[in-house]
Amino acid sequence: MSDGTDNQAQAREARTMGNGALNGAVVAVAGAGGPAGRAALLRLAEAGAVVVGADNDPQRLAEAVDAARYAHGGATVVGETVDLLDLDSTRDWAGRIEKEFGRVDGLVHLVGGWRGSETFTKTNLDDWDLLELLLIRTVQHTTLAFHEALQRSDRGRYVLISAAGASRPTAGNAAYSAAKAAAEAWTLAMADYFRKAGAGQEPTSAAAILVVKALVHDAMRAERPNAKFAGFTDVRDLAEAVAGVWEKPAAEVNGKRLWLTEKP
């Protein structure tokens, strides 16, 4: 990242780019290098936000940041390689953002991963070990690192992407569904923190959960041209829903599951 004074000026200038609640908002995106992350960077930049992406893959992060900058020439979009499995590193990242841009108005959690099995009997607990890190530990670290800064914001939002399977797990998805359910529970606890921090007043910050069946993007369609991907959410539609969380009052989305697919 660059000089903090310059970046705070860029954050103020970003207010002129969009027309909605994200004008000038400073939003961090965890898992910014994947297809969903790329779509989120594009949509948030389009809305006039200052976007700070993080990923563990420097090359794909740089490509995602460059794509968002190219699409929206006046946008401030930066990226940083961060180890979200290390709490201190995650806290340092949150602190750098607030110091350089003056505040943090959002964290979008897009760190993903999937492991499944043919049957419940064939469940491999090594899958759980991996998913616990990707889907739970990164949520724990980002919430603990960012919650106070988000509470200080007048429009703080933490957005988790979850799966319908967390509410209705299938036999072959035991590890994945359990991990998603745990991530949801952790996020809902953060939502209760925001509610209580309001001391009886309407909250200005919120933790919300966007629920999908699964995600689809153009590369998947190209690889499987005959697949219907029924019920899947396109990453661009997900990005639109992410941006929409800021358009609603905090009290309306705090602690809520917002369904982008059919509710079980």
Task: Label each region the model flagged.
Residues 15-52:
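Canonical Rossmann dinucleotide-binding motif of NAD(H)/NADP(H)-dependent dehydrogenases/reductases
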Residues 95, 99, 133-154, 191-192, ...:
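Amphipathic alpha-helical dimer-interface segment in Rossmann-like NAD(P)H-dependent oxidoreductases
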Residues 30, 104-112, 135, 160, ...:
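Rossmann-fold scaffold of SDR-type NAD(P)-dependent oxidoreductases
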Residues 49-63:
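Conserved glycine-rich Rossmann-like NAD(P)H-binding loop of the short-chain dehydrogenase/reductase
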Residues 86, 91, 112-129, 172-175:
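Conserved mid-core segment of classical short-chain dehydrogenase/reductases
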Residues 121-140, 159, 183:
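Catalytic Tyr-X3-Lys loop
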Residues 7, 12, 201-211, 217-218, ...:
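C-terminal helical subdomain
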Residues 151-202, 214:
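Catalytic loop of short-chain dehydrogenase/reductase
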